[in-house]
Amino acid sequence: MITSIFGKVTFVGKRKIIVEHNWISYWFNTKENHKFEKNLEKNKQIFCHIIKKIVANQIIEEAFAFNTLEEKEWFCRLIELNGIGSKTALNLLNNDLEEIKQYILENNYSALCGINGVNNKIARALLSLEIFEKSENNKNIKGVQVADGYDELFETLKSLGYKQQEIQDALKMIEVKPDFDISQLVAEVIKLMSFKNNEITNKTA
């Protein structure tokens, strides 16, 4: 599989670039805050990944370009996760990857949910991302358990009639541990939401 090519960047758009390689021009999809610059004189190393899919009995290829090998590796890992496609993966690359990695290692589900473009399902998928060393497998298991706790808590509160946004705001203020007690967590979150609602009421009174 091709890891990178050397070519001239002949066009730079918001989420696409054109690279000329061996007298052939290729379209590449990119993340929004990429650092590619147009240069018709010098060849540049472009880290790339090709996705092939069948659409209407035809093989369609999509090419993606990255500034660094690290970005390419993250993209390849992300698209292997359930619920994360190429578009979502590119959006995630717009964030601080070291920050995301740290949140994953800390099993910090609520912090992941606070990242731009990350919802509950994506945060859960990220916690299962295999960026851990073999000696840290136990952390990975705990991360999944914590994600299960947040999911159960979210669904329980939603069934009680609370709005999605107020639930998400409250979840960012609590910590779920692997040995969580769902009834205690529900009571804690309801208390937080009630306190917040009272604050809003007092300010508007």
UniProtKB/Swiss-Prot annotation:
Chain spans, region Domain III: 150-205
Q: What does this protein do?
A: The RuvA-RuvB-RuvC complex processes Holliday junction (HJ) DNA during genetic recombination and DNA repair, while the RuvA-RuvB complex plays an important role in the rescue of blocked DNA replication forks via replication fork reversal (RFR). RuvA specifically binds to HJ cruciform DNA, conferring on it an open structure. The RuvB hexamer acts as an ATP-dependent pump, pulling dsDNA into and through the RuvAB complex. HJ branch migration allows RuvC to scan DNA until it finds its consensus sequence, where it cleaves and resolves the cruciform DNA.
Q: What is known of its domains?
A: Has three domains with a flexible linker between the domains II and III and assumes an 'L' shape. Domain III is highly mobile and contacts RuvB.
Q: Where is this region: Flexible linker?
A: 147-150
- Annotated region (Domain II), positions in chain: 68-146
Q: Which GO terms describe its cellular component?
A: cytoplasm; Holliday junction helicase complex; Holliday junction resolvase complex
Pfam families per the UniProt record, alphabetical: HHH_5, RuvA_C
Keyword Cytoplasm set for record: yes
**Region Domain I, annotated ranges:** 1-67
Q: Which HAMAP family match?
A: DNA_HJ_migration_RuvA
Question: Has keyword Transport?
Answer: no
Q: What is this protein called?
A: Holliday junction branch migration complex subunit RuvA
**Organism superkingdom:** Bacteria
| Primary localization | cytoplasm
Cellular location(s): Cytoplasm
GO BP term, pick one = DNA recombination
What does the record note on quaternary structure?
Answer: Homotetramer. Forms an RuvA(8)-RuvB(12)-Holliday junction (HJ) complex. HJ DNA is sandwiched between 2 RuvA tetramers; dsDNA enters through RuvA and exits via RuvB. An RuvB hexamer assembles on each DNA strand where it exits the tetramer. Each RuvB hexamer is contacted by two RuvA subunits (via domain III) on 2 adjacent RuvB subunits; this complex drives branch migration. In the full resolvosome a probable DNA-RuvA(4)-RuvB(12)-RuvC(2) complex forms which resolves the HJ.
Effect of deleting the gene: Not essential, it can be deleted.
Its family remark reads: Belongs to the RuvA family.
